[in-house]
């Protein structure tokens, strides 16, 4: 497998001498980064000595709202907390579409002309629809949820790649509008949710290095 699908820096932050990572270390030291990543994935899939108290993988549940969020995301209607395109008499929300029918691509800047609240720009980079999709996958085992997640997350990473040298000015001021996708609560919420997302998705055949 090609090494170029794996970021080598991944291994710089992992203790390769940790018990259970012997295969990972062996592949890494041989320059086989893809196989090292695959061995790392197998380690996470099979380990039993770590429990995430936030989730229940044996009897997973999902709320009606989270199921709606997961399903709307399949159509590129992404849940952005506090914002929606419309709401009906039963308080069922329809979320904004981020799909550009002209380019047939995701438009991450969509609706900024109508939703001028700065919070809208921040919240959409917190990916609040991804955890509901992970829950929906764990319950249904329907690969469409992880395929949607992979497509969307890959597109976001391609659109907003992290660049070394991101500046973190004091709170407040227009300088916070620079690189805000990689600042503060945007990053914190993504990281916290990804811990749970990984556990829900990890046994999917589509979850690969």
PLM features per residue range, with description:
Residues 1-97:
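Extreme N-terminal leader/anchor segments
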Residues 11, 15, 65, 111-116, ...:
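Short, well-ordered helical secondary-structure segments
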Residues 96, 105, 112-209:
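Aromatic-lined, polymer-binding surfaces characteristic
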